[in-house]
Swiss-Prot record:
It comes from Staphylococcus epidermidis (strain ATCC 35984 / DSM 28319 / BCRC 17069 / CCUG 31568 / BM 3577 / RP62A). It is found in: Cytoplasm. It comes from the Bacteria. The gene is hisZ. SUPFAM superfamilies: Class II aaRS and biotin synthetases (SSF55681). This is ATP phosphoribosyltransferase regulatory subunit. Pathway: Amino-acid biosynthesis; L-histidine biosynthesis; L-histidine from 5-phospho-alpha-D-ribose 1-diphosphate: step 1/9. Gene3D superfamilies: Bira Bifunctional Protein, Domain 2. GO terms for biological process: L-histidine biosynthetic process. Required for the first step of histidine biosynthesis. May allow the feedback regulation of ATP phosphoribosyltransferase activity by histidine. Heteromultimer composed of HisG and HisZ subunits. Keywords: Amino-acid biosynthesis, Cytoplasm, Histidine biosynthesis.
Length: 270
């Protein structure tokens, strides 16, 4: 037990030290967020079902369940001159405490964020002594590009998320692009996608660029996910999920966001 605790703390410390050496600003935020009723958005209120909230006197508090969301909210209200930050700490999900390390880049040009990925990959390989086994790649504009607005009902979106082909066929017909893509192996779906999206569509450009970049850097097992729906309205672009070879519970996830703040985040559960 003692060795496990020490090992986890050492990983967090080595992460922060490494990224500090790579010129990231190390930041530390309280696990408990104090929220301002006057600034809560409709989306914030919808999160109450998935977060631990409580009220004390005239203030409302919540336990952090997502670092990107916390930093997005904070830096939207209090703009920072930091261009890229690194963090380590706890998040609370489904009443479980999870250790997470991650980075945010507030200058999310392609060359910058691919370098962020390489930094993270170096940490995984040389500190965790692990490696990326395969990648799931997607884009939060795909659903809008492939599915007509009148079909984007709650029922249909749930069937897409569940990959319920039989139900979708009854609603959309067999020849619908969503059906034709989902019935293929996820390793082949990127090729199929090109039949239904113009080559210059922003989602297609982003997915192709990342897919080619990963291939050029030796990661060739790339699965497409056309079912993903943005967890927050400010997630509007590419998303990445990387599964590791030796630790099934450790997943590197990331994505582009643009709302009151623009950035790209990567987070790894330890």
């Amino acid at each position: 037990m003692n060795n496990t605790i020490i090992s986890m703390k050492e990983k967090e410390l080595r992460f922060l030290k490494f990224f500090h050496q790579q010129k990231y600003n190390v930041v530390d935020f309280n696990l408990i967020e104090e929220l301002d009723w006057q600034r809560l958005t409709h989306e914030d209120l919808q999160q109450m079902d998935e977060r631990s909230f409580w009220q004390q006197n005239k203030s409302i508090y919540a336990l952090r369940n997502d670092f990107t969301d916390q930093l997005f909210r904070y830096y939207s209200n209090y703009p920072t001159h930091f261009k890229k930050v690194a963090y380590a700490g706890d998040i609370i999900r489904d009443n479980r405490v999870i250790k997470q390390v991650g980075i945010e880049n507030y200058e999310p040009q392609f060359d910058n964020i691919t370098q962020n990925f390489l930094d993270f990959q170096y940490f995984i390989q040389n500190v965790l002594h692990d490696d990326i086994q395969f990648i799931i790649l997607g884009h939060y504009q795909l659903i809008d590009a492939l599915l007509e607005k009148n079909h984007q009902t709650r029922e249909v979106m749930e069937m897409i998320e569940e990959r319920n082909l039989s139900g979708l066929i009854q609603t959309l017909t067999f020849n619908h692009p969503i059906i034709q893509i989902l019935k293929e192996n996820t390793l082949n779906q990127l090729k199929i996608l090109s039949h239904y999206l113009p080559e210059r569509h922003p989602a297609m450009v982003a997915i192709q660029s990342w897919s080619q970049w990963f291939t050029d850097h030796g990661i060739t097992e790339i699965h497409l996910d056309v079912t993903a729906q943005a967890p927050r309205s400010y997630y509007k672009g590419i998303f990445i999920k990387c599964h590791l070879k030796n630790t099934a519970h450790s997943v590197l996830t990331g994505g582009y966001y643009h709302g009151s703040l623009e950035g790209f985040g990567l987070g790894l559960t330890l």
